[in-house]
Amino acid sequence: MTTEHDYCIVLSTTANEQNRDQIIKGLLEAKLAACIQTMPIESHYVWKGEICNDTEWLLVIKTRRELYELVEEKIENLHEYEVAQIVQVPIVDGFNPYLEWLRESTLSRH
């Protein structure tokens, strides 16, 4: 039985389509994510004391919380940034058939 707190969204950004596609392929092939949505974004941030803005790709990664550390490790190993954005957002609740599909589509650690 799953609970609504078993799932999370991982957010990451990358600078180009090639790195985006590497990360997506790596996560999906390892069954560390059930679904990854992408969209172009404009990021504004401070880096090494300078105000910067860049066009990036946002990755919205749907997975299970128990897989987060593996997801983080996979992204870190494939990512081109010196400091990659990799953050976890818990899914508090969701449509049960979707959450069940998410569970069935990802790596089982049991």
Language model features with spans:
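Positively charged, small/polar-rich N-terminal and surface patches that mediate targeting and assembly
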Residues: 1-110
